[in-house]
Design a protein with these regions (language model features):
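Short, solvent-exposed interaction modules
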Residues: 56-126
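Short glycine-rich, low-complexity/disordered patches
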Residues: 40-68, 149-175
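A cross-kingdom feature marking solvent-exposed beta-strand/loop segments within repeated
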Residues: 7-27, 114-129
Length: 187
């Protein structure tokens, strides 16, 4: 699932207002798990626990990005030669229920292929969106509904594709041994 986070400065001229942009890719299974936690009450319970204990860890964290090699291959290499790290975090909010944060900046690809952020507390792009419980729930469940509709349409298209005609099996050819024993009963 592709989520686009952006900030805008309305004082700038039209067409130049976007000041930060971070594209986050969340695996479908992770999105569905977040939706399950929302609908089951697990996330509301966890949110209450975190508020009570003043825990600062994110409720959800997604690490991603594009390797330096791929950036080079597609003609978008960074000037520092590093990978592009993208992170998304869902935090317990102070002024609203949630704070959904997306960051991007330099990263390094580790041995397993994970792109590890190397921007510390200073990302090149930072977008934070405060969301109420209802707003976040609506956003997640609407995204889930759209994914399910897309999946149903995909299956429908697959079912409508013409079936390839099966090749006819070659005619059975009798061997001399078969004709010799055709008249004999087995028992």
């Amino acid at each position: 699932v592709h989520l686009g986070f952006a900030t805008y400065d309305m004082k700038l001229p039209a067409g130049q207002r976007q000041t930060n942009s971070v594209h986050i890719y969340i695996a479908v299974d992770e999105l569905l798990e977040l939706c399950r936690k929302l609908t089951s009450g697990e996330m509301r319970h966890r949110l209450a626990q975190m508020r009570k204990s003043e825990e600062k860890a994110p409720l959800y964290k997604c690490l991603g990005g594009t390797s330096a090699e791929k950036l080079q291959r597609i003609g978008r290499a960074r000037s520092d030669g590093k990978s592009l790290s993208r992170t998304a975090e869902l935090h317990c909010g102070k002024n609203a229920d949630f704070l959904f944060v997306a960051n991007s900046g330099p990263g390094e690809t580790n041995k397993t292929g994970l792109i590890v952020p190397r921007f510390g507390n200073n990302p090149e792009n930072h977008v934070a969106v405060s969301m109420s419980w209802d707003c976040f729930s609506g956003f997640m469940l609407t995204t889930k509904a759209h994914y399910e509709a897309w999946l149903a349409a995909w299956y429908t298209r697959q079912a409508e594709k013409p079936v390839q005609k099966k090749q006819e099996a070659p005619a059975r050819v009798e061997t001399p041994a078969e004709t010799k024993y055709d008249d004999m009963s087995m028992f």
